[in-house]
């Protein structure tokens, strides 16, 4: 027999099937998806690869076919359906097959099982008493102590015996040899969630919730599988609807995957699912230990778990009978991978569901333009929930023009209106959230005389000032001491653009010394359980004000929060990205949804320098329809997704001149082969950051009405790049409908 193998080398020229002979000793245990050790190249270097299929026939000269050395015993095998999914992802998004295979295999190495030992008493009550008397007579205190404990509790934890009873291993062995007890071992799964109590709490659903639940249940039980878009305002009870949908699927003996956009959402989301489904729920994220991740994947593979919750990578959970994929907050950009293959979880979920006879539910208060566009075309079933589940009123929104604040002499980042409302909420013993889409103690350093901005020498991005007198590059990690005079003109009038979460925290503490303030951003959430600790502390009312980046306004439910302040609402509005209006609208609308979720009315303050922008106006009015209509006209006029499709050809090289020349040839090739295809080629151009770690970057954008047209173009470009030696020093990647330009 022979095996088709993809070698574990990420090079385009080796991205093909290599056939190997299977030795007799491995024929019974080798299966597709296993990692194997193989001789490769002229020197027969031992490398690893993945078996994609087995065959009885050889496609090459038999005398030249090499033999597999062994199976990689410590690796996790990829299931056949995930191999097929990887092949589809390679075709759709580019990259190599080995990159795609590693993407669909979140856990690559086996981990040693965690074993728990017990001591079990083997004697009858009468025999035990006789033995105890014997040990006491012989003054064998440790043996007597252990046997006495076993008489009271016939099964004892091994660790308790050795630590609490102070009994050594030789004593335990002696009693085992005498037939008094037996040492038993069992495998224990590492559960990353400490609380797992199931509670039957009756939920009274609104008419809107019932309509969605019944519609889904009717479809599912009739065998209809489709993709649903659930557009529900913040607080409308989308999570309760998800759980009822999952219950329908689980009752049919199937499993469900629930994707979340950020690790910060895991704690609250998982607790709600645990209360509903108990320990049949599991969690997967990057902060778990290798052992925890391995245990949860193996439980899912064996069908011991009904629901897997996690970020994008949880999409590849190897459930035996997948019935439903839920993508909560589907508009979030974190669902798009920035690593090759640059897939979008929404598209891969829809494809996996089609293959495995499952349904997909996309949920959001601010659906992505792509999802709503497809729903309007009839590709997705649209459900809408326009009211909050407990009939709370939507928050009152105030838009503050910061230009007027400056004219009135207020140079603080907190407007007079916001300061007034914060004081009011503190007096009322209510909670406040203040968010800023910035990281670090402050922003960039600029000279007020010549305008020079201090940048990273390796990345062409501004350095940010952090506490401790350091200036840091957030792209490559470069650090240098804080400058005291301008390196360009020598002026001492150089300083920070003050807009960082640490800076806001300090200002709030100074302005409201009586307030207890917590901060949540990338710097305060680096440790494993830091998200959980900060969110729990705020939920338990251990703080009055939570200051943070955009992660604090996404999906969290704090009933005591009655005021939300968006401190720099338009900071993301004029980035070099066609999605900037959409992102600003989504962020502000999500922020507005955090206020007034309990029985108290909520208020939101949006601080902006451009109150007339349609994204600001629509978010203040919480009017998705108004925003969508204006935004889709803009996308249609400019030929941007979702109306048309966009492919970014990303090229990188250490030699800037060679990079410019190669990109020119690439563009000429595209224009030469496009024929009658409707293509619009833009560039080559410099991306927002044109150099990272001394590697220069350029990008060519190609627009086309049909996605398939771009896939075919990508395939031909890959062939062109492979046969032309001029591209050997280049790294070229493809990104379809990129989230960032």
Listing of model-derived features with the role each one plays in the protein:
Residues 1-364, 376-392, 676, 711-715, ...:
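Accessory, non-ATPase domains that flank or precede helicase/AAA+ motor cores in DNA-metabolism machines
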Residues 2, 15, 44, 429, ...:
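A general secondary-structure signal for short beta-strands and their flanking turns/coil
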Residues 2, 6, 31-32, 658-671:
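A short, contiguous, amphipathic alpha-helix enriched in charged residues
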Residues 53-55, 105, 185-187, 436-438, ...:
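A general secondary-structure junction signal
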Residues 55, 59-72, 687, 692-705:
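Solvent-exposed, membrane-proximal periplasmic/extracellular interface segments of envelope transport
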Residues 200-206, 210, 224-660, 672, ...:
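Inter-lobe coupling/hinge segments of SF2-like helicase ATPases
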Residues 668, 672-692, 696, 717, ...:
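A carboxyl-terminal module marker
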């Amino acid at each position: 027999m022979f095996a088709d193998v993809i070698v574990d080398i990420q090079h385009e020229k080796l991205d093909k099937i290599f056939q190997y002979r299977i030795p007799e000793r491995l024929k019974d245990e080798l299966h597709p998806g296993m990692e194997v050790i193989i001789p490769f190249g002229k020197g027969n270097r031992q490398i690893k690869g993945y078996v994609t299929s087995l065959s009885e026939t050889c496609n090459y000269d038999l005398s030249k076919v090499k033999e597999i050395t062994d199976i990689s015993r410590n690796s996790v095998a990829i299931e056949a359906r995930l191999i097929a999914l990887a092949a589809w992802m390679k075709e759709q998004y580019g990259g190599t097959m080995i990159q795609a295979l590693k993407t669909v295999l979140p856990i690559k190495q086996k981990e040693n099982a965690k074993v728990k030992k017990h001591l079990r008493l083997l004697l009858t009550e009468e025999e035990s008493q006789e033995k105890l008397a014997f040990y006491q007579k012989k003054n064998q205190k440790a043996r007597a102590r252990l046997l006495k404990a076993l008489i009271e509790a016939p099964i004892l934890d091994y660790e308790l015996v050795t630590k609490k009873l102070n009994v050594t291993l030789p004593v335990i062995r002696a009693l085992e040899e005498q037939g008094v007890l037996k040492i038993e071992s069992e495998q224990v799964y590492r559960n990353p969630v400490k609380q797992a109590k199931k509670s039957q709490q009756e939920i009274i659903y609104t008419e809107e919730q019932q309509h969605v639940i019944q519609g889904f249940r009717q479809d599912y039980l009739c065998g209809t599988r489709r993709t649903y878009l659930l557009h529900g305002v913040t607080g409308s009870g989308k999570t309760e609807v998800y759980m009822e949908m999952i219950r329908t699927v689980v009752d049919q003996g199937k499993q469900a995957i629930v994707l979340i956009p950020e690790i910060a959402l895991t704690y609250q989301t998982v607790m709600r699912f645990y209360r509903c489904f108990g320990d049949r729920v599991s969690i997967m994220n990057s902060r778990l230990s290798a052992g925890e991740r391995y245990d949860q994947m193996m439980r899912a593979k064996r069908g011991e778990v009904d629901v897997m919750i996690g970020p994008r990578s949880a999409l590849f959970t190897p459930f035996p009978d997948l019935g439903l994929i839920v993508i909560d907050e589907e508009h979030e950009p974190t669902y798009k991978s920035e690593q090759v293959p640059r897939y979008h979880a929404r598209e891969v979920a829809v494809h996996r569901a089609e293959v495995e006879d499952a349904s997909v539910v996309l949920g959001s208060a601010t659906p992505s333009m792509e999802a709503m566009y497809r729903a309007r075309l009839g590709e997705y079933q649209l459900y809408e929930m326009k009211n909050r589940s407990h009939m709370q009123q939507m928050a009152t929104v105030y838009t503050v023009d910061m230009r007027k604040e400056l004219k009135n002499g207020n140079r603080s980042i907190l407007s007079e209106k916001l300061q007034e409302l914060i004081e009011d909420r503190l007096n009322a013993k209510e909670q406040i959230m203040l968010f800023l889409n910035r990281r670090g103690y402050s922003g960039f350093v600029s000279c007020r005389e010549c305008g020079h901005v201090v940048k990273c020498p390796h990345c062409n991005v501004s350095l940010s000032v952090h506490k401790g007198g350091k200036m840091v590059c957030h792209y490559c990690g470069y650090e240098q001491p804080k400058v005291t005079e301008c390196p360009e003109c020598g002026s001492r009038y150089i300083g920070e653009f003050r807009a960082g979460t640490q800076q806001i925290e300090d200002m709030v503490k100074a302005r409201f010394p009586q307030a207890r303030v917590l901060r949540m951003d990338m710097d305060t959430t680096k440790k494993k359980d830091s998200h959980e600790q900060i969110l729990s502390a705020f939920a338990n009312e251990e703080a009055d004000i939570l200051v943070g980046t955009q992660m604090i306004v996404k999906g969290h439910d704090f009933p005591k929060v009655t005021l939300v302040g968006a401190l720099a609402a338009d900071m993301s509005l004029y980035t070099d990205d066609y999605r900037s209006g959409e992102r600003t609208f989504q962020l502000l609308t999500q922020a507005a949804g955090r206020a007034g979720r309990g029985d108290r009315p909520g208020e939101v303050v949006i601080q902006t320098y451009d109150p007339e922008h349609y994204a600001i106006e629509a978010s203040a009015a919480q009017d998705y329809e108004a925003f969508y209509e204006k935004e889709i006209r803009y996308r249609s006029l400019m030929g941007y997704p979702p109306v048309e499709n966009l492919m970014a050809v990303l090229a990188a090289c250490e030699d800037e001149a060679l990079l410019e020349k190669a990109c020119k040839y690439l563009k000429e090739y595209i224009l030469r082969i496009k024929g009658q295809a409707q293509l619009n080629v833009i560039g080559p151009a410099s991306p927002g950051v044109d150099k990272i770690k001394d590697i220069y970057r350029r990008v060519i954008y190609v627009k086309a009405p049909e996605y398939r047209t771009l896939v075919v173009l990508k395939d031909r470009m890959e062939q062109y790049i492979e046969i032309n030696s001029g591209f050997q020093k280049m790294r070229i990647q493809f990104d379809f409908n990129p989230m960032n330009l």
